[in-house]
UniProtKB/Swiss-Prot annotation:
<keyword id="KW-0406">Ion transport</keyword>
<keyword id="KW-0813">Transport</keyword>
<dbReference type="GO" id="GO:0006885">
    <property type="term" value="P:regulation of pH"/>
</dbReference>
<feature type="transmembrane region" description="Helical">
    <location>
        <begin position="67"/>
        <end position="87"/>
    </location>
</feature>
<keyword id="KW-1003">Cell membrane</keyword>
<keyword id="KW-0472">Membrane</keyword>
<feature type="transmembrane region" description="Helical">
    <location>
        <begin position="414"/>
        <end position="434"/>
    </location>
</feature>
<keyword id="KW-0812">Transmembrane</keyword>
<dbReference type="GO" id="GO:0005886">
    <property type="term" value="C:plasma membrane"/>
</dbReference>
<feature type="transmembrane region" description="Helical">
    <location>
        <begin position="194"/>
        <end position="214"/>
    </location>
</feature>
<dbReference type="InterPro" id="IPR023171">
    <property type="entry name" value="Na/H_antiporter_dom_sf"/>
</dbReference>
<protein>
    <recommendedName>
        <fullName>Na(+)/H(+) antiporter NhaA</fullName>
    </recommendedName>
</protein>
<keyword id="KW-0739">Sodium transport</keyword>
<feature type="transmembrane region" description="Helical">
    <location>
        <begin position="314"/>
        <end position="334"/>
    </location>
</feature>
<feature type="transmembrane region" description="Helical">
    <location>
        <begin position="166"/>
        <end position="186"/>
    </location>
</feature>
<feature type="transmembrane region" description="Helical">
    <location>
        <begin position="343"/>
        <end position="363"/>
    </location>
</feature>
<dbReference type="GO" id="GO:0015385">
    <property type="term" value="F:sodium:proton antiporter activity"/>
</dbReference>
Length: 452
């Protein structure tokens, strides 16, 4: 495992990678909230007609007289979101191999927490919608928006322990994995066998590339596009293709870190061996060659998985998810909305606000009492409850599942209003709860210091 960790990011790299992830996701959450607010304002202002008309704009190209394309809304939800799910898949793979989910013992607690945070909200929703046309939306309150949740923790600053942040990230990664499984199993249309067979063949080729030691990302990208097309046509949501692609991206770099260190040392010595005065004015051809080789080796020593994840992170955090939020969070609130459609509103709201913390705290408590899992060091039960409240922020992932679960526009609008309301309430509740908890903890530590 130590050897694999070097492939991921070097000594101490996992912690740096995690801190960078938390930092970027936290700011992304604040930006997402801003985009959601702008979307709601646009949908309920004089711009309303233009806002909704924009997403129905057809974008594509003609082959002869045949138009191949989709609405802008579908380009965002099916194509752009595939890049987000590719990043999610890479994060899941990295966490399973090197992170907090590496090994059964380390993964047990956050995995059980995520399981509780998915099962109980689904049960709560089903209790309100059993036997109705809206029962298919049980997956909506199962999701957690990690960017929003970490954004709330960012507002609390250094008062929140790193252990709690790590737990919340680990929980969210498993939650994302659960969401992928739910989408693949429960929100799949009638399967087209031939296209499914094509998908399996292409996936086999991707696995073959990995096994053959191909480290260039270009062939994976080509086959990834073909996989997206075949999965989209076979009836499974195309974002699942992105997750499958992520799991075939190689972890091991082209050059081992020990070999890179030796080669880099030799190249630097060769660079410095040339005339210094000449080098100050114009690099000699040998020096240029050394620099080019060093640059090439620097890329080859990086894990393809981590390199791709780093490349996708800023695009996902500051473009893809904000665009998705702006395109999907806008709901025109009017007297024509029927909030009493089955039990959609209470099912989603109570599922996220109550079901999430109860499920996370309840199942982890039982697991520890039964000796199945152990709480992370430095994380108290009251912290688990606070994290459970923040996990109730469903937002983007819940909205994404809403679009798959409902075909009725009225049910979709009610679900989005419920998601936005519940996410806002869960975020505020989690913020004040953890803030008060940190304040009492600080006072207690101060008292202990005075006594000692």
């Amino acid at each position: 495992m130590a050897e694999n960790q070097d492939y991921a990011s070097g000594n101490g790299g996992i912690k740096a990678l995690l801190l960078n992830f938390i930092h970027s996701q936290s700011f992304s959450g604040i930006f997402l909230f801003f985009c959601a607010v702008v979307a709601m304002i646009s949908a309920n202002s004089a711009l309303s007609e233009s806002y909704f008309h924009l997403w129905h704009t057809e974008i594509g190209f003609f082959i002869g007289e045949t138009f191949i394309g989709m609405s802008l809304h579908h380009w965002i939800n099916d194509v752009l979101m595939s890049f987000f799910f590719l990043m999610v898949g890479l994060e899941i793979k990295r966490e399973l191999l090197f992170g907090e989910l590496a090994g059964i013992k380390r993964a047990a607690f956050p995995a059980i927490a995520a399981l509780g945070g998915m099962i109980v909200p689904a049960i709560v929703y089903t209790l309100f919608n059993f036997g109705t046309d809206s029962a298919h939306g049980f997956g909506i309150p199962m999701a957690t928006d990690i960017a929003f949740a970490l954004g709330v923790l960012l507002l609390l600053g250094d008062k929140v322990s790193l252990a709690l942040k790590v737990f919340l990230v680990s929980l969210a990664v498993v939650d994302d994995l659960g969401a992928v499984v739910v989408i693949a199993i429960f929100y799949t249309e009638d399967l087209q066998t031939l296209w499914l067979l094509y998908s399996v063949v292409i996936l086999g080729l991707l696995i073959g590339l990995n096994k053959m030691g191909v480290r260039s990302l270009f062939p994976y990208a080509i086959l990834g596009v073909l996989l997206w097309i075949t999965v989209h046509n076979c009836g499974i949501h195309a974002t699942i293709a992105a997750v499958a692609l992520a799991f075939t991206i190689p972890v091991k770099p082209k050059i081992e870190s020990e070999n890179f260190a030796q080669e880099a040392k030799e190249l630097l010595e060769r660079f410095l061996s040339h005339d210094k005065e000449r080098a100050n004015l114009l690099l000699a051809s040998e020096q240029v060659h050394s620099v080019e080789l060093l640059s090439k080796h620097s890329k080859s020593v990086q894990s393809p998985l981590v390199r791709l994840e780093h490349a996708l992170h800023p695009w996902s955090a500051y473009f893809i998810m904000p665009v998705f939020a702006f395109a999907n969070a806008g709901v025109a609130i009017s007297s024509n909305i029927h909030f009493d459609i089955d039990g959609v509103l209470p099912g989603i709201m109570l599922g996220l606000i109550v079901g999430k913390p109860v499920g996370i705290l309840g199942l982890t408590y039982l697991a520890e009492k039964m000796g199945i899992a152990t709480r992370p060091e430095g994380v108290m039960w009251i912290d688990i409850l606070g994290a459970g409240m923040l996990a109730g922020i469903g937002f983007t992932m819940s909205i994404f599942i809403t679009n798959l679960a409902f075909t009725n526009p009225e049910a979709t609008d009610v679900a989005k209003i419920a998601i936005l309301s519940a996410s806002l309430f869960a975020g505020a509740l989690g913020y004040f709860f953890i803030s008060i908890r940190c304040r009492f903890k600080k006072k207690k530590e101060a008292c202990c210091t005075i006594k000692s």
